[in-house]
Swiss-Prot record:
An example Gene Ontology biological process: positive regulation of toll-like receptor 9 signaling pathway
Basic and acidic residues bias locations: 46-64
Annotated region (Disordered), positions in chain: 46-73
Induction data: By interferon type I, type II and LPS.
UniProt-recorded name of the protein: S-adenosylmethionine-dependent nucleotide dehydratase RSAD2
Reactions performed catalytically: CTP + AH2 + S-adenosyl-L-methionine = 3'-deoxy-3',4'-didehydro-CTP + 5'-deoxyadenosine + L-methionine + A + H2O + H(+)
Cross-link (Glycyl lysine isopeptide (Lys-Gly) (interchain with G-Cter in ubiquitin)): 208
Cofactor: [4Fe-4S] cluster
Post-translational modification: Acetylated by HAT1. HAT1-mediated acetylation of Lys-199 in turn recruits UBE4A that stimulates RSAD2 polyubiquitination leading to proteasomal degradation.
Subcellular location: Endoplasmic reticulum membrane; Golgi apparatus; Endoplasmic reticulum; Lipid droplet
Keyword Metal-binding recorded: yes
Amino acid sequence: MWMLVPIAFALKLLNVFLQPLGSVWSSLGPLFLQLRAASWLAGGERSRPLQDRREAGEPGRAEGEDGGDLPTTPTSVNYHFTRQCNYKCGFCFHTAKTSFVLPLEEAKKGLLMLKEAGMEKINFSGGEPFLQDRGEYLGRLVKFCKQELQLPSVSIVSNGSLIRERWFQKYGEYLDILAISCDSFDEQVNVLIGRGQGKKNHVENLQKLRTWCKEYRVAFKINSVINRFNVDEDMKEQITALNPVRWKVFQCLIIEGENSGEDALREAERFVISDEEFEAFLDRHKDVSCLVPESNQKMRDSYLILDEYMRFLNCRNGRKDPSKSILDVGVEEAIKFSGFDEKMFLKRGGKYVWSKADLKLDW
């Protein structure tokens, strides 16, 4: 049927040019509108952008017309833009193997590409993200993502030791969530783990950051890695007092080449706990309403991790295998090698109320 459209259009166009010149222009407009409508109908669903089809209810890995999968949507991305850190946590699984950090404009270019591919949430991590240019590099990325890309959620994971109030004054309005890593409320345990700050007290600093988050209207979150040195600790009282929007509790994870093996910068084997020990910790804290547990099984394939070169890291085989950079091959091609399990992402609660505008917090 649609093969007749070009023929009919050609005949009408010929007829137009046989008319006097004054009538030509008044006749061309309706003809082109007719052709555009015909082309849209012929294209049908195929003419609609991928993001529009997803918004209509089609899943991120829906089957395409040729039987293949549609590209994965990078809804939530963790961008580890630096590997450098001022702590030496023994179980760290993203260690300082390079000192590379992308030029700011290149990083912005990649973030724009991710937004165009469907990204809604960006989480900046490291290493320690506040280490680069004393937090200025991070602050500019945060502002860019919220103000120019208008992402629903912009978050940071930090050890908190380098954050100053002036950073909140300058960039706090653009940040939705600040997650601070705190594995213990016993300062001696923090020293054993590698979170020691010399004369600074990690727990006291945590309380100061909580106050700043409230003052500058940033949602406050705590991340804890449960390991051999804190697995028997009872944190209910302290977590309840700090009242974070989420308390993310991770089981200590082994990643070959990062915290285990010949080429690793850490030896995390002595920190590892069993699944049963992790479950016992969770059971002890089951009455903490903000608790969000993540076992090794839930963690491994349910995060989209972007490294300092903007390569997706595939952790499916217990190590980090990088894709090519999205800056070189684009998001759709690079994400094919991410090993991302979208079902597990949803199962672990990866999609939640992550914009401070929607959290309705009692500041």
